[in-house]
């Protein structure tokens, strides 16, 4: 029979405090079964502030990423287990492995068809002692928060310091860090692959029937993955139709394997009939068919 695949997704969080309050709030979540924190709200406030300061200092374009979030879908059998225990186990597994702070919540969607964990984690760790930088001479910052070399660069024609610019006098603190820099491993594809393996294994630990075990989806396999339909997705009908076509292909691939057709042959058909045709169609119509 066709393997069931685990679903684990990662998101970037530009507003970690807002996201924490959203996933952990009974008022905003219809089916919230448990929440778990490894650090208090002061930690997250400080993290958000320092991330924004660092981002401003770097002068990088785009959005500041304050933290990241994993979404882990759990098989329906998990609804029979004690929610707080499940959430604690899954969150502590992450903290033990990566040594970072987390906040998590266990939810069901509205129709109670998708039992899942939201796990927010910090990419920075607290320093043993705050790193405080004291100005050995006057330090100047322009309107964007960028450090400049001379007072002249932030002085208007009237001889006054321009609005929004700052001067830190000698002996004053001009920068302080409570956290390390971001751990870059969380950005990479290898991390997502690893965490999918880790959580798929953990999910399977609590499922006694091997037939029900989940597998990490292998994009080089004969099967096509289903697409997830998010809340209030305007393309819901399109995605449902697309998923039905994918299931049809997966059933056909199953039948072909059972009838003795080699995996290599099926992969060849998948490549020519699906991937190549889809990319031609995308080039000509700009549609996402796969």
Predicted region positions:
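N-terminal nicking endonuclease/strand-transfer module with a His-rich metal-binding environment
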Residues: 1-290
């Amino acid at each position: 029979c066709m393997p069931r695949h685990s679903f684990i997704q990662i998101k970037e969080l530009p507003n970690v405090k807002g996201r924490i309050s959203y996933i952990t709030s009974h008022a905003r979540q219809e089916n919230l079964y448990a929440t778990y924190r490894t650090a208090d709200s002061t930690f997250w406030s400080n993290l958000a502030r320092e991330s924004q300061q660092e981002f401003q200092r770097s002068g990088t374009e785009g959005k500041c990423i304050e933290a990241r979030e994993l979404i882990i879908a759990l098989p329906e059998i998990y609804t029979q287990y004690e929610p707080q225990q499940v959430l604690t186990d899954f969150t502590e597994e992450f903290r033990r492995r990566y040594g970072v702070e987390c906040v998590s919540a266990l939810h069901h969607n509205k129709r109670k068809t998708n039992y899942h964990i939201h796990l927010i984690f910090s990419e920075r760790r607290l320093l043993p002692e705050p790193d405080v930088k004291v100005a050995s001479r006057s330090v100047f910052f322009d309107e964007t928060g960028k450090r400049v070399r001379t007072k002249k660069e932030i002085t208007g024609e009237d001889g006054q310091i321009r609005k929004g610019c700052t001067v830190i006098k000698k002996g004053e603190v001009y920068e302080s860090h409570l956290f390390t820099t971001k751990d870059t491993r969380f950005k990479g594809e290898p991390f997502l692959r690893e965490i999918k393996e880790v959580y798929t294994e953990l999910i399977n630990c609590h499922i006694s029937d091997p037939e029900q075990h989940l597998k990490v989806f292998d994009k080089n396999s004969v099967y096509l993955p289903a697409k997830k339909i998010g809340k209030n997705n305007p393309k819901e009908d399109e995605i449902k139709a697309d998923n039905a076509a994918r299931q049809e292909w997966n059933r056909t691939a199953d039948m072909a394997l059972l009838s003795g057709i080699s995996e290599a042959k099926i992969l060849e058909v998948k490549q020519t009939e699906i991937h190549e045709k889809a990319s031609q169609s995308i080039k000509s119509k700009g549609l996402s068919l796969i």
